[in-house]
Design a protein with these regions (language model features):
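Acidic/histidine-rich, surface-exposed loop or edge segments in extracytoplasmic proteins
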Residues: 13-14, 56-60
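Short cysteine clusters
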Residues: 28
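Phosphate-handling active-site elements
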Residues: 38-54
């Protein structure tokens, strides 16, 4: 399915710019949550510190293992309780090793706290949030078709295509083609994935693979 035939209803990817890269670290959820949080803060706050968010989410996991990912509850609690500063307060460390020193700076600057909550997995509810200009955090299974999107094409594959892992992205738009919706997602695999780090997912690909959806309250506290 060609993107050129898609009737786009909402697209606020320009609010974010080109996607960043998480490298080989399991930080996709921290990237997705940080981008959604920064959008909720608004006022040109810039990028928020993924490192700070991931550190505090890891601290809230039972194993406290930086080499594995974190779950929705951990990142949600971390951003609500611990918050996060701007990226400059603790820049991302793409090559952090398992035994490297790792602790937040004493004075990272202003801290932004946000309330990230779960929402319905119904894709109609996702579209409702996008219609309001609110990005939606998505945690989903990903299969082979997700890893190398064909240029100018909408990602789609049978629900039987084997899952290769669980990944977090954010939805920043949607459109329709032949009475079916597709969703524009922002990834954290750098600009070489998709189109500058973005790609379209057909509803038939997303719906059976979606595990968690979440949005930030638009009420943000700064300390």
């Amino acid at each position: 399915m060609s993107i050129s035939s898609l009737a786009i209803t909402v697209d606020f990817s320009a609010d974010f710019g080109a996607a960043r890269s998480q490298g080989r670290r399991p930080t996709c959820l921290a990237f997705a949550a940080s981008d959604c949080h920064a959008h909720a803060v608004g006022n040109g706050c810039g990028e928020l510190s993924v490192e700070f968010a991931f550190y505090h989410a890891v601290e809230r996991m039972v194993a406290k293992d930086r080499s594995t990912g974190v779950n929705f509850g951990a990142i949600s609690t971390a951003l609500g309780v611990d918050g996060q500063p701007n990226e400059e307060g603790w820049p991302y460390i793409p090559d952090l090793g398992p035994a490297d020193d790792w602790s937040p700076p004493v004075d990272p600057g202003d801290i932004f706290h946000g309330k990230l909550g779960r929402m319905s997995l119904d894709l109609g509810s996702v579209r409702d949030e996008l219609d309001k200009g609110i990005p939606v955090l998505l945690i989903m299974d990903v299969s082979k078709s997700f890893f190398q999107p064909a240029a100018g094409r909408i990602i789609n594959a049978a629900s039987t295509e084997r899952a290769e892992g669980i990944h977090a992205v954010i939805a920043v738009g949607y459109g329709h083609l032949e009475n079916a919706a597709s969703y524009l997602v922002r990834n954290s695999w750098g600009e070489k994935w998709g189109s500058n780090g973005y790609a379209w997912l057909h509803e038939d690909y997303l719906e059976p693979r979606l595990r968690v959806a979440g949005v930030f309250s638009q009420e943000v506290q700064t300390l």
